[in-house]
């Protein structure tokens, strides 16, 4: 795919310039969303394959793969010029085939073969295996005769070409199409634009993005919508005369088509082995013989061009436009991305679309031998592929990802068909909620409590949550990837109020009862329990990574059964001999804060208001939390043992009083403080976070403790050492006496399970329970407060509910704690914006819970009216349904009413075939909802689920008081609600304040999409390269970092194809590195791809996409594209205000960027409005004395001085000076610069005042006064400032410092004598590091440097202080793959 992108004339920008990456061999043809939690990480623990040895090999393997020799071949096609293309020996012949079908001059051919010296090439052969193929070989394109299948593929391809410019597929959420507007905003490809001069820039921002604007229009969300492209044909469809009758088949007829041209002529066309021709049939008469002339052509496009001049002209225009589009605008995404708003679309006649809808197959299915796919076999076979070497792992991961994304697409389509009543149940006689379905070799079940299976755990509420928990289990077991242990392909789909679980089918499971199939686990929640030797071995291996503790339980016959998972986890050996596990809903231990137990919780948990009794008993702790908890306990264990050992040594050496005292100093306080089971100061221990790495203890102490532990292990006094370890194990709750072992028993609080217990052992059930309680307490006592504390520096400021949820999940905090988090945030003024986002997310989730039931009680005919009524009740003051709905409901004749009644009766309370998901209750029930009743339900749900009080009872009768009190905005609530529930609304302006008519009517509800949750297979080698690259960057080796991340991107392209969120992240990092290393043009090219990709795979208004716009604007400005830079920043600010309003730290950064560029082009008044808003936000979120605020004051002063308002400028610069003086000291360079600036402004103000006095007194100017200098800023100084506020700082080292550096190095060389080159290099590096540290402070506030002959050394922002961290999104070190 990537190869074909490059051949389309786009220069490859990611890797090294002298080599091209190996393209993926297969394309994902398919669709969906982010992974189940929105975050793209499925890492559990490094698999056994990624050990040190493999890693050593991997560098050379990667180079071998990526530097694979390319060569040039010539392609000769009939009727077009010969074409030279660069190919790789690892490519398949199929890829040349695909390339030709994509090129402008050959795209209309599909049925052809490629021949070398008269020999037809095998499509699935690698080029290196083709005999005689070498540099300069000529490959001929030979037209082949059509078969029925080939003719259908050709027609489908022609139809795809004709609608390639039509965005309908993206709006309808089909064929992995999605929207992108970057090129609409920038009016074409940025790279092809000429540099703009500042005097010719149109830079007026639209009124709605100005600071303080209350209006939030929706139409600019999708600019340029409604522009119609060229239309080549009115109708192209299959004819109603199909299929050809027997006699005509014997004459070679394959199929018939019907065409209406733009000239309004109608033609019937026959397909035969030689191509397509006009026949003599009409709409009423079947006459299949060739017409005169018949225009026989091998390609349908050639035929249509002959019969319609308009088609010939329009098709050429369309092709030109299609090939001008960036390849990233056309490539399919791996999962379908849905948009929450859409314009009114024309619905055209399209027989192929109709055929796809009503066939039971999946679009591409007829191209695959054997028709429907055996999903289970495909999913499991790909996991069994070898994985020893890098090429093997790449092939395996690519195959896993490809099959998985296809499976997600098929499962989503099947789930919609099930709920739409388009699939027959396998148990049609049962109640609708109990029905199960099989479609396309996928098993579908509904989220209801069938046969009281979850009665003890919360009934339907538990049944609704169980699939999501099961998916968590599948995710972690898949990521651990133990050889020989298999999980089912699993996708959870929420659609129209129903939760559907789609699973691949274990071979043979449908042939026997479940009781006969299960060889491990329990099917009745612990009454009968089975164990199996092989399963114990496999699950024990996986359990080591997942921290699951092996335990024994008693079955009904009082027999002892050993388990290495929860009791519910079932093991089934399929007919294929594979060991499958399913029902993984209790993979992780229960969350005791949400269970009513006989036991007491700790004081801290009680103080937080726990336990809260949930509707279900399936609340589990997250894996991220368990990892953080175990790491924290391990550090505690080390410190305890070290402290005990010190005391032991002290007692031995009483005669030496001084030494032990000093030794003990480092650890004693920490160990004593920690010896209570948990320590308040101990923050999150999450891998990859610097604080976590030391558990909150100063580094010296932890290092000291580790050294002491080493001496402990080598100690001769074994018994004393054992005692020390034993006491440390007891202190941290280890499940072994003489070894640190913290794992969790997921069944420890399961009702009805009898555990085998030894009360006096280290692993007694009491201790196992205590560990689970401690982990829940750790979440409340450490993770939540440390999350709130870390938010105070605003480095990763979530912008909406999805990014907030993602951040919480990364720390192991479940969303059910969001009420408690919101209460904490409410107390901190600097986190007001985050409190608003948290409350908004709580309201949306509560509304979604109510909406699910509401949708289930609504019949299909009233769906649009019911959804619009719900939105009216939710966001406005609504009492009754809109008049149109009333008409719909009341106007039916009595016969119509009777028919509906009969239909409901026939359904028998929901029993039976296809009407099963039509509502079986009175269809008027939804009309009874009012704003008051809905908000009462929302408040009740918030209290029962999150223990959160929105406002005092009785004060909420509509959205208005809630919106006002919590600083929410209705457009953001509408967006979030639509994304959560899958509702798509009409793109128009909505007036939420209208009183006399409803805001929403049924015509505003365009569609309802599925919301899909699934696992995200990971490209492990690419991830390793990426993280190594990040480490290099943090050490200051940018070129090495760049090369490693380029290789990571090549590997990602290999595994995921060209489109994936992780690819976008890689591109952003490469663009930033290119910019830091002094190549802004390269940075611009790469960042443009990052923005396009983010729009396609994350969504046009996703916070990640918004974050990609600001760097692109910076790189545009650096390339003198000023107008484009402003348009991009306006777009980013508009999207941010739709998502979260303009009260957010990221808005301050955007406003500072906008104001600087407006300042550069002389729009001082506009610039000042944005600057003052940025200043107000910075004061609010960073405090009045922060360096960010100092910079904002300075920028305001600079702009005011350019406007001639010296008095105001003087006042603002005084604020800057005061902050610098307080924070950096009077002697600091920045303070001196500010002082100089004050002197200059004072001088200018005095001159101005004298001139004014002169005019007032004499009516004319006296000569001799110096002129007033209002110097417009240079583009260079503006760019310096832009770099600084975006966290990119080029450290300046003066000539004097360089001289010092040289002297120091020479001195060391003399001292070291012949120490060799390596020591000199090391000395050099150390001295550079020292100088950098000293000089970083000079640039921390980012004011432009005075012109001087300086040496520049670029440094990424992550290594500097306040200013550098101003944007985590732009911070090259902050992101991770």
UniProtKB/Swiss-Prot annotation:
Pfam assignment, any one: TPR_10
InterPro entries reported for this sequence: CLU-central, CLU_dom, CLU_N, CLU_prot, GSKIP_dom, GSKIP_dom_sf, TPR-like_helical_dom_sf
Cystine crosslinks: none
Keyword terms of this UniProt record: Cytoplasm, Repeat, TPR repeat
Domain Clu as annotated: residue spans: 353-595
Region feature (Disordered): 1-61, 651-700, 886-917, 1310-1377
Main location: cytoplasm
Biased composition (Basic and acidic residues): 655-690
Location of the protein in the cell: Cytoplasm
Entries under HAMAP family matching the protein: CLU (MF_03013)
Family label: Belongs to the CLU family.
The name this protein goes by in its record: Clustered mitochondria protein homolog
Native species: Culex quinquefasciatus (Southern house mosquito)
